[in-house]
Amino acid sequence: MASNLGSSNYRYQVGGSLPVNAPTYISRAADKLLYQSLLVGEYCYVLNSRQMGKSSLRIQTMNRLRSAGIVCAEIELSGIGSQQITPQQWYGGLIQELVSGFDLDIDLLAWLCDHAHLSPVKCLGEFISTVLLEQIQQRIVIFIDEIDSTLSLSFPADDFFALIRNCYEQRANKPQFRRLTFVLLGVATPSNLIQNKASAIPFNIGQAIDLEGFKLSECAPLIAGLTGFSPHPQAIIEEVLYWTRGRPFLTQKLCRMVANQLQKRSDLDVSVDEEKQLVKTLVKTQIIDHWESQDEPEHLRTIRDRLLYSEQSRALLLLYQQILAGKQLLANNELTQFELRLTGLVSKVGGELVVANPIYHNIFNQAWVDQQLSVQPSPAESVYRTSGVSDLWDRLIEDSN
C-alpha cells in the first residue's frame, strides 16, 4: 500500500520490500556496516524482528554490490517450502535456486542423477564447489532470506548451517572459497536454528548486523515527502519518530496517514504545535484505538501472536512486565531476552532493554499484560497438562462414577 503526494508521485510504502529506487528508503548504519563487511568477504547475519527492513536492506545492498562488480543472488527459503518436504527436495530446491539466481549453464536433472549417490547436503556442497565456483569466477555473495523457515522443516537444518560454516573454513586451503560469502537473514535466534548445540555453526564466525530505528539525521527522504504540504515538515517527522522510535513499518505508515491529511488541507498557516497535535491525534484514533481492527496491513497482531504463541509465552510476558514497569535490565544473549527482542516489542538502548516505542507501550500496557497472564497456565499447570497426568486423573474420575 502506498500514498501518492500530489504530482510528485512521492510514495510512503507501508509493508513489503522497498524497491531500489524508492524515494523513502532510509539508509542506516546497518547499510554501511553490511556493505563494508561484504566488500571484505565477511559472512554476515541479520536476525531481527519482523518489519524492520531486512528484505529492503538486502535489495539495496545487492544493488550496491553489483555496482561494485560482485555477483549476487538471493534465496528466499519460504519459496522452497518447509511443510511435508523431504531433505532431497529441500536441498534440490536450494540447488535450483542457485542455478536460476546465477543463470548457470547446466543440465541440472542430469547432474543430479550423476550425484544421486551423495547425501542431500553433500550434493549441495559439491554443486557449490564444482559448478557455482567454476562457472562464476567473480566474487559471489549469496543472500539467504527467511532463514527461520528452517524451523518448520521435518528434519534438522544443522547440516545446512554446518555446510555454510564449512565453506568458510575451506578458505584456508581452497582459494576459490575466498570468493564466496553468505548473508543469513530472518527472525530467529541462533540457538533455535541449531538443534544439536555441539554443531559447528556459522553465527560465531560472521558479522552480526543490528537493525535500529530511523534517526532524525537519516530521515531527509521522509521530510522531503511532506515539503510543500506543511511549513514544518521536520517538526512533523520529529513527532512521528517520537511515537514510532523509527520503526520502519510504523514510521512509513504514520507518514502516509499524515500525508493524506495534509493533502486535504488548504490553509498552510499552521503552527508547529498544531502539526504535532495532528500526528498525536492520528496515532490515537487510527493506530491505538481499536487497534486489532485497524491493524492493516498487519503489524501489531504479528507482535501479539509471536508473544502469546511462543512456547515460553509466560516467561516472555513476565520479562516484558519488568521492562514495562521501568526495571533496568541489561541486555544480554540469554534466550528469553533474545526471543522477546524478536517479537519487536522491546529494543536495546544504551545496553538496556526498553519498550520499543510509545505506541507499543500504550497498546501492550500493564493491563494488557495482566490480562494475558491471568489466562496463561502457571509452570506447575503446564507440567500437569503436558505430562499426561491430567488425562489419567480425568479417566480415573470417570471410571469411578
Spell out what each predicted region is.
Residues K174, T189-G206:
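Short regulatory helix/loop adjacent to the ATP-binding pocket of P-loop NTPases
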Residues A2-R28, D107-A110, I201-N204, L300, ...:
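Conserved adenine-nucleotide phosphate-binding loops and their immediately adjacent elements
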Residues S217-T343, V349-G350:
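Winged-helix-like regulatory helical subdomains adjacent to P-loop NTPase cores
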Residues S100-D158, L163-R165, E169-T181:
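Mid-core helix/loop region of P-loop NTP-binding domains shared across ATPases and GTPases
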Residues N63-Q83, I142:
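Conserved catalytic segments around the Walker B and adjacent sensor/switch elements
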Residues A2-S49, K54-L65, T130-V131, N401:
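Walker A/P-loop-proximal flanking segment of P-loop NTPase domains
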Residues Y360-Y384:
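Short, amphipathic alpha-helical interaction segments positioned at domain boundaries
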Residues C72, Q84-L108:
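Conserved NTP-binding/hydrolysis module of P-loop NTPases
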